[in-house]
Design a protein with these regions (language model features):
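Surface-exposed, gly/pro-biased binding rims or lids
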Residues: 22-23, 31, 117-131
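Short coil/turn motifs at secondary-structure junctions
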Residues: 24, 52, 91-95, 105-109, ...
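Residues at secondary-structure transition points
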Residues: 34-42, 79, 99, 121
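Catalytic strand-loop segment that frames the active site of acyl-thioester-processing enzymes
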Residues: 4-39
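Hydrophobic beta-sheet segments that form the core/acyl-binding groove
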Residues: 72-107
Length: 131
């Protein structure tokens, strides 16, 4: 366990985020392809949500995380109507930088895998820096 700013996170922490693929989640609607299948950007978003939610309840009020890196392979297509889920596992930490192993599945198979990095932020300071 590593403690940063009174934040205690354990390597191996996992979270599962799931949804059912709708037409709005397809490559055709999203604009990332012509097929009516689960879009790669939507899969990556599901993976990011799993990683964000894995640590969300462990952060003090006023802190959250932002995505800083994705290295993902989308290895299989998924049809509209199928249930999909992403699992994020915290595998490394370097102060405020968090590294997650991420995988996505549908009802039949693994559909994606890779690495996702997030950074812990003080929300107020972060938003003030954008003005």
């Amino acid at each position: 366990m590593e403690i940063i700013m009174d934040i205690a996170l354990n390597i191996g922490l996992k979270y599962k985020e799931e949804k059912t693929v709708a037409m709005n989640d397809t490559a055709k609607v999203f604009g990332s392809g012509a097929a009516e299948v689960f879009a790669t950007p939507m899969m990556i978003g599901l993976m990011e949500a799993a990683a964000m939610n894995a640590v969300k309840s462990h952060l003090p009020e006023g802190y959250s995380t932002v995505g800083i890196s994705v290295n993902i392979r989308h290895i299989s297509a998924t049809a509209v109507g199928k249930k999909v889920w992403a699992v994020a596992e915290l595998v490394d930490m370097d102060r405020k930088r968090l590294v997650f192993k991420v995988e996505a599945f549908d009802e039949d198979k693994k559909i994606g895998e890779g690495k996702h990095e997030r950074f812990i932020i003080d929300e107020q300071k972060f938003m003030s820096s954008l003005k």
